[in-house]
Amino acid sequence: MIRSIEGLRGVAALMVVFFHAFVLARWGGAPAQWGLVQNAWLFVDLFFVISGAIMAMVYGQRLQDGRQVRAFFIKRFFRLYPLHLVTTLTAIGAVIVVQGAKWAAAQAGIQLGGEQPFAVEFFKPSYFLLELVMLQGVGLMTEALHNYPSWSLSVEFWLYLAFAVLFFFVRSTRARVWASAAIVVLCLAHFLRVFSGLGPQVLAPDVHGMPRGLLSFFIGVLVWYGWQAVQPRLRNLSSTVLGAFQLVLAVLSLALIDMRADLGAWVYAIPFVFGLWVWSLLPDRGVVAALLQTRPLQWLGVHSYSIYLVHVTVLTFFDWPGRKFGEPLKYAVVAVFVLAVLLAARCTYRWIEVPWRDRGKRLAGRG
């Protein structure tokens, strides 16, 4: 794994946590007014770009026959599904526990929060069935329930299918690049059609999750092949120059996220800038790469998948104090919430993510 990209993944996961707490859960406070937090959902697109680049790097030469494709799917399934299933169940269970506590308090004449217990729909059997088969984010439902960030997980799962099929049947590098570029162009055309008013106007996962994932994922694939093409000529590029390029792209990426509401159609340039940022980090040296390789960010990167999936369960328990308390006490709640997320992520990483990932590797190796 490229360590700087691992660290970048950790930063992205933490930003999504802040978005869901301050914006989606309506915790408010000063951070909810910052464009970087309001638009932190865009870091999911960065996840897709990173995933495309890493898949092309690791599996570009490994999908040559049916046995290798089978091993790929087994490893991907065991990498994603066990933690997805557990966190879906814990997210549902957390709501039942919290709403049950509110109901019990109401019976004693104590009101916790503004809503009545169980007043908001929190479980839908049809959505749960789609979650079980990883179809909740591909456009079959018009909402995101339960462990709602997992919509992107379902998109990623089917992106792996598209990637494996493409790379199995298309063997030459040139053809793969052209095919990936065609997918990117088609997705971009789809979103420009949306922006022009000819398509669904809500940029939500239920409508646009799959094209959104396809666009960013195959930008990532192109990033890897672009790096492969120029790597021999850039081998002697100084770390100072490379670091300056990384810094410009990091600042540009964060600025575009912050200004998202004012960009108009240029918002669709953000995944391409993400792609350039990831491209600049592939050598794993330079000032930004060094920052992302620090121990705290590496820890976040290693645990990023668990952080991403477990934080909604934790957020459910902190939702009422997060909204009730004003500043500055709110930030004490935020600090405890983040620590609880990191602790929960450590537990799920150690006891669910890693053991099942290793089981998948062993099972894939038997073929």
Please identify what each model-predicted range represents:
Residues 2-3, 32-44, 126, 142-155, ...:
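Interfacial loop-to-helix transition and helix-capping segments at the boundaries
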Residues 3-62, 81-84, 88, 126, ...:
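Functionally critical transmembrane alpha-helices in membrane proteins and complexes, commonly lining
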Residues 44-78, 83-109, 221-228, 314, ...:
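Juxtamembrane transmembrane-helix termini
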Residues 44-60, 152-169, 180-235, 267-289, ...:
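Specific transmembrane alpha-helix
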Residues 80, 126, 132-188:
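Hydrophobic alpha-helical segments with transmembrane-like composition
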Residues 81-153, 270-278:
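Membrane-interface helix-loop-helix regions
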Residues 213, 217, 222, 240-354:
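Alpha-helical transmembrane segments of multi-pass integral membrane proteins
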Residues 294-296, 354-367:
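Membrane-proximal cytoplasmic C-terminal regulatory module of class A 7TM GPCRs
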